[in-house]
A protein has these predicted regions:
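N-terminal pre-domains immediately preceding structured catalytic cores
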Residues: 2-192
């Protein structure tokens, strides 16, 4: 009789251990604490953040956005820069110029501009900050424009031209950049 129950009990124990192991591999408590690879669905960027050699003429601390490359560079000392993948404005929405970061917000609220509502009447008129918000985990506001460098709840759009002119980053990348720059940082947008 004991043998009759021993095999099913052993099978259940094995399945439970296997499922727990798989869950442990997938679940990373840093994900919900803001530092793991799936930070609030920010996902990993299809274009990984990396330090590169940089021979541009911009001063350390400057952000340089290259829309044609779909990359953002934070100029560092010693001829280097941090390079991030970004999503850029789709055709008709790309722009260039020089601005300063005038505000920084964590988990920003979003109010779509009237022009966007006219194009997309299905959009909410206002969204509180959070994981469903298209501005993602952080936003840096550019001058007096409506444009921002911000996170995204759609990490798969990084490297694409899909926005209405803002620069999208994964939540991990925008959180990293946000911690490195301050209000007053110069942002150069190259639209070539």
């Amino acid at each position: 009789m004991i043998r009759f129950f021993a095999a099913p009990i052993a099978a259940i124990a094995l399945l439970t251990a296997t499922a727990a192991g798989a869950f442990a591999e997938e679940f990373d408590s840093r994900d919900i604490m803001g530092g793991g690879p799936n930070f609030f669905r920010g996902g990993s960027s299809p274009i990984p953040r990396t330090t590169v050699m940089y021979n541009g003429s911009y001063a350390p601390g400057t952000i340089v956005v290259n829309t044609s490359e779909r990359r953002l560079y934070l100029v560092l000392q010693n001829g280097q820069a941090l390079r991030y993948g970004i999503g850029v404005g789709r055709d008709g929405f790309r722009w260039g110029g020089v601005h300063k970061i005038t505000a920084k917000k964590e988990w920003p609220e979003w109010t779509p501009p009237s022009q966007m509502i006219a194009r997309r009447p299905d959009l909410p008129r206002h969204m509180k900050g959070g994981i469903e918000n298209p501005l993602g985990a952080r936003a840096m506001y550019l001058g007096s424009t409506l444009y921002r460098i911000h996170g995204s709840n759609e990490p798969e759009t990084i490297g694409q031209a899909v926005s209405s002119g803002c620069f999208r980053m994964t939540n991990d990348d925008v959180t990293d950049l946000y911690g490195r720059v301050g209000v007053g940082t110069t942002v150069v947008v190259l639209n070539n």
